[in-house]
Swiss-Prot record:
One of its GO terms (biological process) is regulation of sporulation. This is Probable cell division protein WhiA. Belongs to the WhiA family. It comes from Streptococcus agalactiae serotype V (strain ATCC BAA-611 / 2603 V/R). It holds the Pfam family WhiA_N.
């Protein structure tokens, strides 16, 4: 199950008491038709649970029992498109939800009573996300939450509504509409709080923390590996110089203090400078070991 589906299923588990959730769904997924008996309203979704949710809201708030139809885009079951079809009280619904424009169409922007009221705003954002919202999988590390709108002014109003909740929302135009989006992990988690998807918010944070911890461990391992590689490279240079000294003037030609360091270096190529210092009979600092190794290398270079 995708993270987007998890969020939507959590939202569908809540009882919807604010009609502005339905307002957003109709605004973003609804279309008006005209027949002999008057206006009709069709609300489409590819999610059967969302279709049932829309049915329940219409039944609760307007005492309607709309028809649910479906057709298939392909032969695959998952490609069903569900339509909640309403023929009664359409004008009442549009007026009550403040959706109708002056030309008996659906108003494209967001009504001020929604923008100016926090509870209405939260409900509207819930409906908007249920309708066209998606969240990129949090373990991808490329965080993004998007809500698609057919109309640019609606996308901009959505961004302004999100900004009222201190979210850094942005809008980008597409060929067939516009997208309101969030790209910061903290904004996405806060958005999930706003729409009351607390379980999804906690799951998002947990996945984010696990990923960041894994990345920190990998970075630490990479640094350690690089340090070991540098140590071994420097170690092999010194060992080759010690062999050169042994083959030319002989190991005993080195002063005893240099011989001690040389013996530990040859015996333990992977030792760090500190480990060499700790292995000597006479205690020595790291700088003291480095000084002796430089002297060994200098002797070899002069041969």
């Amino acid at each position: 199950m995708s993270f987007t589906v998890k969020v939507k299923e959590e939202l569908l588990g809540h009882k919807s008491e604010n009609k502005m959730e339905l307002s957003a769904i109709i605004k973003m997924s609804g279309s008006l038709g005209l027949a002999n008996h008057g206006l009709n309203l069709s609300i489409t979704t590819e999610n059967a649970k969302i279709a049932r949710h829309i049915y329940s809201m219409l039944e609760e708030h307007y005492h309607l029992q709309p028809e649910i139809k479906y057709h298939q885009k392909t032969n695959l079951r998952k490609n069903r498109v569900y339509t909640v079809f309403i023929e009664e009280k359409v004008d009442v619904i549009l007026a009550d939800l403040k959706l109708a424009d002056a030309f008996f169409g659906i108003e494209t922007g967001i009504e001020h009573s929604i923008l100016d009221n926090d509870e209405n705003g939260r409900a509207y954002l819930r409906g908007a996300f249920l309708s066209t919202g998606t969240v990129r999988e949090p373990d991808s590390g490329k965080y993004q939450l998007e809500i698609f709108s057919v109309y640019l002014d609606h996308a901009q109003d959505l961004a302004n509504l999100m900004k009222k909740f201190m979210l850094d929302a942005k809008v980008i135009e597409h060929k067939h509409g516009a997208v309101t989006y969030l790209q910061k992990a903290e904004d996405i988690m806060d958005f999930l709080i706003v729409i009351d998807a607390m379980e999804a918010r906690d799951a998002f944070e947990e996945i984010k923390m696990i990923r960041e911890t894994r990345n920190d461990i990998n970075r630490a391992n990479n640094v350690e590996t690089a340090n070991i590689a540098r140590t071994i490279t420097a170690s092999m240079k010194t060992i080759n110089n010690i062999i050169k000294i042994m083959d030319t003037i002989g190991f005993d030609a080195l002063p005893s203090d240099l011989r001690q360091v040389a013996q530990v270096r040859v015996a333990h190529p992977d030792y760090s400078i500190q480990q060499i210092a700790d292995s000597l009979e006479t205690p020595l600092s790291k700088s003291g070991v480095n000084h002796r190794l430089r002297k060994i290398n200098k002797i070899a270079d002069e041969l």
